[in-house]
Structure formats: structure tokens, C-alpha cells
Amino acid sequence: MKSEAIAMRHATPAWTDIARDIGDTFAARAAQHDHDGEFVAKNYADLRDRRLFSAGIPTELGGGGASHAEVCAIVRELGRHCGSTGLSYAMHSHPVCANVFKHVRGDAKATGALKKIAANEFVIAGTGANDWLASNGEAIEVDGGYRVNAHKRFVSGGPGADLFVTSAIFDGDDGPEVIHFAVPMASSGIEIQGNWDTLGMRGTGSNDIMMQDVFVPAEAVVARRPVGTWHPMWDVIVPVALPIIVSCYVGLAESAAAYALQSASGKPHQAPAIGQMQNDIAVATMALEDMIRIVDNYAFTPDLSITSDVLARKAIAARSVKSAIETASEIVGGPGFYRGHPMERIVRDMRAFHFHPLPERIQQEFSGRIALGLDPIEAR
């Protein structure tokens, strides 16, 4: 079978062409979004107008039919032009793609959700940071569902989202468990804090969100799991999500390389540094393409070993992207140290890569524990 990594290179170009066409507009806006710490709202409007938010949904459900590899290619292209837009779009796309994985296996809830997203070109935002294994917040059972109070962080794309995907802890008769659910972002009791003022990725709008007595209908709950332990659902989410997220940063590194090559024109003494930078980008690209190959357009069978392999490749890509961008910055030199130069912004945006699960040291422990036959996460 032809691998998805190879298929990505020869995919029907329509979606990446669209991303490239609007990417020039996004690049022109990027400096202002970064300077103001302002959410990329106009870019989201352009993405919606071109139905990119439903691109990864199968055509039979009303979407654009882009494969997992093609979604990664879209994100990579957006990342070349505006890191904040690429990352925000990635954070919308990965829960969509996780639902595609479930849809092709007959999950009726996932199918229904995808149809609704495609019909309305809905945008998703979910929680990040450490809000996954342990979760946070409290869900109290009430008539017809739950009442949730929580403080959620790193909600990328929140200001432009229609749906909020998150979780909370429900302490029922059988003990505490985490419930996962999606609710409209406009639900009563949801308040976006407007506190995203960061080093990099300043246009993602990844603000904190306060949930105060938010009603979650019982039918909105899509999963339940124990608190603080590894659950098989992550063996779907992690392999599907990480190649999409990594694609943004590989695109960012490719953008940095373009500025470096432009700066090094006519300077043969820069050849060794250019070669080093290209090597790092090659390593990051190989890691990304192998992640996409592993997912195989949703044909993979979830397993801890696959999750570990994908996490290892994410760590390799992160290290290589960081090295490539730092070298590119050295090649560009002093001009790239000034505010307003794209290289200065790219250097700061790259710093966000570390924070996506799992940071390298934690990944090494995770993969090492699996190799030793231990549970991937030590009980704490």
C-alpha cells in the first residue's frame, strides 16, 4: 500500500493551493497580529469562507474529503505564512480528524458531529496544557445532564470558535471519573478571559476560559474515563493529533529557511550553516512524514507502542525545528533581531513547540517505561 507520507507529496493540490493562495494575505497580517497580541479573526473568516474548517470531513458527510495527510499539508502551508493561524487551525483540525477516525469505525456520535460541523462550517476549540490525564473542574449531575464549573487554559482559537471541547471531573457513586463533552462556545456561563499575552504564537487567542454553572446535556458526553491514568482513547487522539500540530512548526522552519537563504545570497561563507539548517529541516520532515505514515489515513490500529513511536517522532521534530530556526536566525543576523522582522517572530513562535504533549523529557520517560513493560504514566 502506498504510504500516506508519499501520498501527501502527490495529493490532489486543491486544498494546499487554497491555503497557499490565502497564505500570502495571512503573512501580510502576521506582524500586526503579533504586535497587538490580537486573535487572527480575519484569517479565520477567510478560512471559513473557503470551507477549510470542514476540509478534513469526508465528502459523504458534507465535508471536503481531505485525507489526514492533506490536512497536515494544509497546516504546514499555513504555518509557512503565519504560525498563529497554522497552529489555531491545527487545534481545530485534530479533534475533527479524531472524529473521522471514529466515524470510519461506525461511531454514530462522531458521524453526527461531523455532519453538523460540515453543514455549518463550525469551528472547534479545546483545552490544552495539562488538561488531559487529570483534567480539572467539577461536574455535578443535574436533571438531564451536568452542571460544570472549571477554569480551563490554553484554549487556542477560542475567540473564533463555535464549539468548546473539554472535560471535567464527575465524582459519582462509582468514584471520580473524567467526562469529555462538547458544548456551544456561546453557552451561558462560558467566559473567555482575554489574558493571552505571551512570548510567541500571540495571535492564537489561547485564552483561559471560565466555566460557571455551564449546563452540559447528558447526550453531549462523548467519553468517560478514570482520573489521572492512561486511557486507550489517547492511543487514538495522540497519533491523529500530533502530526497535524507538528506540521505547523515544520512549515514555520521552512519559512525561516527561506529568509535565511535570501539573506545568504552571494555569501558563500554561509554554506556550512545553510547545510546544517537544511539537515535539521530534513530530519524534522522525515519525522513528520513517518508520523503521517503511521496514521495511514486512519487505518492504524491504536496501541501504546504506536503512541510511543509518534511521541518520539514529535520530540525529534521539535528538536530539529528548534535547531533549524536558531541556525536560520544566525544566518539572517542582526536584522532578524529587530521587532517587526519575520525572523524575530518565528524564533518566538517556535518556542511554543515544546509545550505540546509530550515535552521531550516527559516523552523519554513515557517511552522508556513502555519499553520496560511498565504503565506509561507513573501513578502519582
Per-range role (PLM):
Residues 335-380:
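Glycine-rich phosphate/cofactor-binding loops in nucleotide/flavin-utilizing enzymes
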